[in-house]
Structure formats: C-alpha cells, structure tokens
C-alpha cells in the first residue's frame, strides 16, 4: 500500500477539502480537513476517516493509524504546527 492508495481510499469515500498522509510501511498518519468534521464528536471523526481503511487494516497492510481532523478555519491556524507529517 502506498500513500496515494490510502489517500484514494479515503477520498473516494469522503469529500474532504484536504488530506495529508504519511506512511512508513506499517504506521499511517492522516490529517483530514473538512468543515463537516466540526459537527461530529471526536469519536465519530475518527470513525469517519478510519472506516474506508478497514479492509487494508484487516489485511495487515496497515498496522497503526494516527488521525487528526480539522475544519478549514482551524486548519488555517494549525497547519504550520502539523506539517510536514
């Protein structure tokens, strides 16, 4: 699995304004940016981003996932502290 594959799995399932993915062969770090995420609980945000990855995680292609979510306005303030992954 490559970064572009992970990005595609997520963006095919969810409409995001931005996505940033880092993957080292086992651990995946994801930053997802979309305004609708602001309406969800912390758990629901994680579940929303995690769900499209369930199959590759179950297949053992990804062993650990770290997810950070932001609305677009919060991302404008926070991106300097969160990039690069």
Provide a role label for each language-model segment:
Residues 1-85:
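N-terminal, polar/charged subdomain of small-to-medium soluble alpha/beta proteins
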């Amino acid at each position: 699995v490559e970064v572009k594959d992970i990005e595609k799995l997520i963006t095919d399932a969810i409409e995001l304004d931005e996505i940033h993915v880092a993957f080292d062969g086992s651990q995946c770090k994801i930053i997802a940016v979309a305004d609708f995420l602001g309406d969800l609980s912390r758990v629901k945000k994680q579940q929303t981003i995690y769900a499209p990855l369930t199959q590759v995680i179950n297949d053992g292609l990804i062993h650990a996932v770290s997810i950070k979510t932001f609305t677009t306005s919060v991302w404008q303030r926070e991106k300097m502290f969160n990039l690069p992954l």
